[in-house]
Amino acid sequence: MQRNPNPNNLPVELNRTSLYLGLLLVFVTGVLFSSYFFN
C-alpha cells in the first residue's frame, strides 16, 4: 500500500481538505440558521 507515497498522499489530502470544507460549510450554515431563527 505504501509503494507510491505521492499518489496515495494526494487523494488523502484532497479528501481531508474537502472534509474540512464540508465541516466549515455545515458550521457556517448552522450559525446562520441559528442566528436567523433566534432573531
Swiss-Prot record:
Record family assignment: Belongs to the PsbL family.
Keyword Transferase attributed: no
Cited InterPro entries: PSII_PsbL (IPR003372), PSII_PsbL_sf (IPR037266)
Keyword annotations from UniProtKB, A to Z: Membrane, Organellar chromatophore, Photosynthesis, Photosystem II, Plastid, Reaction center, Thylakoid, Transmembrane, Transmembrane helix
Cell compartment(s), UniProt: Plastid, Organellar chromatophore thylakoid membrane
Entry function: One of the components of the core complex of photosystem II (PSII). PSII is a light-driven water:plastoquinone oxidoreductase that uses light energy to abstract electrons from H(2)O, generating O(2) and a proton gradient subsequently used for ATP formation. It consists of a core antenna complex that captures photons, and an electron transfer chain that converts photonic excitation into a charge separation. This subunit is found at the monomer-monomer interface and is required for correct PSII assembly and/or dimerization.
Regions crossing the membrane: 18-38
Signal peptide start-end: none
GO cellular component: organellar chromatophore thylakoid membrane; photosystem II reaction center; plastid
Name of this chain's protein: Photosystem II reaction center protein L
Recorded superkingdom: Eukaryota
One GO BP annotation of this record: photosynthesis
Organism field: Paulinella chromatophora
UniProt membrane topology term: Single-pass membrane protein
Pfam families in the cross-refs: PsbL
